[in-house]
């Protein structure tokens, strides 16, 4: 499994896959429409967010970082998906409204058990582990 960071690429209308492995750290290693990650963390760089607010222009400052079980990428239809039998929650990020990723009720989300990142939404299994 490879550690990667995913962000929405507004120029190419897709997701950029950035390596988080030591030898290629920060290098773009691919593009996709959707990707599945295990044990993701939702990261927002506050300085980048503040720059968006100041300049009114988006920049790369929010990522989903996790382990990709297979870089043979696939696309999913927009539908409800159950990961590991657990229900999923849609997770959003809007730098103009929130300083973190949030669920549909506006509650902050920092990590999940698994996540499907799509160009239009993020679907996460945020159930607590026992």
Regions from the PLM with identified roles:
Residues 2-9:
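Structural detector for short beta-strands of small beta-barrel domains
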Residues 13-16:
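Short aromatic-glycine-enriched beta-strand elements
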Residues 121-124:
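Cysteine-centric segments in proteins
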Residues 127-130:
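Short acidic DE-rich linear segments
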Residues 18-117:
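Acidic, low-complexity, intrinsically disordered interaction modules
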